[in-house]
Amino acid sequence: DEFVKVPGTTFKNTNGDAAVDHYQRVEEDIRLMAEMGLKTYRFSIAWARIFPTSMDEVNQKGLDFYHKLIDLCLENGIEPMVTIYHWDLPQFLQEKYRGWESREVITDFKKYAVTLFEAYGSKVKYWITINEQNIFTRMGWLTAQHPPKMSGEEKLYYQVNHNVFLAHAEAVLAFQDLVPDGMIGASFALHPSYAIDCKPENVVAKMDYDDLKNYWWMDIYAHGRYPKAAMKYLQ
């Protein structure tokens, strides 16, 4: 919310104060979804709406809104699918320790995730930890298109990604204990690649591309380790 108020960061200098006004129109929105025959609604919970000023104080009104949203989905035959983090880090954490740049965020993210699991785990079966980690980290620390608006910080970019991986893992482990009958994973913006021909050097180039642009994230989500090419690059 703070970032989009900076002139020049968004198209036509729009901001998120009202956006699509889902908070006020939630009943109408879910009714329209039901009329359209939608069977699943994937939505994101705003971390800053649950913990707006401190990780020591939960905003009950925020929890209540998502209870209402989830209940409306279920009443209308729509399966809720919750995304825990969709790029809305609370501003106070950015100011306190620079957010994802610090390992302190791992503990705070786990606390936030556990709060959601305890609140909604009996109603929601399908969960997503992080939305498109490879996008928000690249645009935040390499191309300055997203907060914290940094460019060319390659070493920091990889450290941030490592912190996000650890936060994801902590959330998954907590989820398995608290919502044993649920399903959880990460959302990833895959960048498909194809070798230009069957020459061995081009096939290997395609494999290296996948290791550096896709499996760097996917292997960690699935296997808990970096691909060999990624590790060699980091070293």
Predicted segments with their positions:
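Active-site region of glycoside hydrolase catalytic domains
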Residues: 1-10, 53-55, 64-235
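N-terminal structural segment of carbohydrate-active enzymes
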Residues: 1-59, 63, 69-72, 76
